[in-house]
């Protein structure tokens, strides 16, 4: 449930009131349905939605990092699988995301990369309230 709340929170931060985004809404509903049935893939589904949100709103991450001055501080290749994970999220549909091997380091790198993009383009700082709630539950 916390991941679902986080999806709602980032959608709210990234969109303007009364500015319809039917494609984004469809992706949100689809990801929420998948999260309900694939609890073992919550991270990958969350990242997929972040990537889709960025792409649909015109901020598709440049994974090549060549000339990406706005994101030089974010290295998508900082772990063994992170670039492959990000490329899979960009190139696959929700129904075709492969089962990926995700290490702890991958989780940190991919999460930081996507969060960095979200914060850069949507100008929000601080942790998501839903993630802070999850941390408290898990501690």
Question: Can you annotate each of these PLM segments?
Answer:
Residues 1-139:
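Non-catalytic alpha-helical scaffolds and adjoining flexible linkers that form interface surfaces
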């Amino acid at each position: 449930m916390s991941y679902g709340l986080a999806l709602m929170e980032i959608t709210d931060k990234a969109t303007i009131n009364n500015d319809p985004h039917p494609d984004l809404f469809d992706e949100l509903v689809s990801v929420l349905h998948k999260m309900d049935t694939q609890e073992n893939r919550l991270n990958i589904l969350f990242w997929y939605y972040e990537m889709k949100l960025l792409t649909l709103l015109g901020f598709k991450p440049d994974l090549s990092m060549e000339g990406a001055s706005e994101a030089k501080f974010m290295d998508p290749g900082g772990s063994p699988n992170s670039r492959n994970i990000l490329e899979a999220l960009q190139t696959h549909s929700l129904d075709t995301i492969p089962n990926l091997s995700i290490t702890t380091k991958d989780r940190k790198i991919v999460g930081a990369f996507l969060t960095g993009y979200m914060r850069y383009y949507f100008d929000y700082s601080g942790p998501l309230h839903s993630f802070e709630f999850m941390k408290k539950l898990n501690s």
